[in-house]
């Protein structure tokens, strides 16, 4: 299992568009991928579960991946988040 702590820096946090980009990306992987904020955990392949985390700007999340492509999954998610979900702010 691989994990990575990341800070959400985009203005609107994990809103619908950002969550949709996460789901699109994570569905390319076979690994089980989760996002954790505080004591709440969401399946990163479910837009509704991601939105229920209510992740705002400045929040720290923990991404975990478990499976044969876990390293690639964590890497690609980290890059997406570092690019602020390709949003112009």
Question: How would you label these PLM feature ranges?
Answer:
Residues 1-5, 60-62:
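Intrinsic-disorder/low-complexity, polar/charged segments enriched in Ser/Thr/Lys/Arg/Asp/Glu/Gln
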Residues 2, 45-50, 73-77:
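Short amphipathic alpha-helical patches
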Residues 6-7, 21, 72, 77:
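Alpha-helical protein-protein interaction elements
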Residues 7-48, 52-57:
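Compact, glycine-rich, soluble single-domain proteins
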Residues 56-89:
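C-terminal structural segments of small proteins and small subunits
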């Amino acid at each position: 299992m691989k994990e990575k702590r990341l800070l959400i820096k985009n203005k609107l946090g994990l809103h619908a568009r950002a969550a949709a980009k996460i789901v699109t990306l994570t569905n390319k992987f076979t690994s089980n991928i989760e996002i954790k904020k505080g004591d709440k955990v969401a399946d990163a392949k479910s837009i509704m579960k991601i939105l229920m985390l209510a992740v705002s700007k400045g929040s720290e999340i923990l991404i975990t991946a478990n499976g044969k492509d876990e390293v690639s999954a964590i890497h690609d998610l980290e890059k997406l988040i570092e690019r602020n979900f390709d949003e112009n702010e």
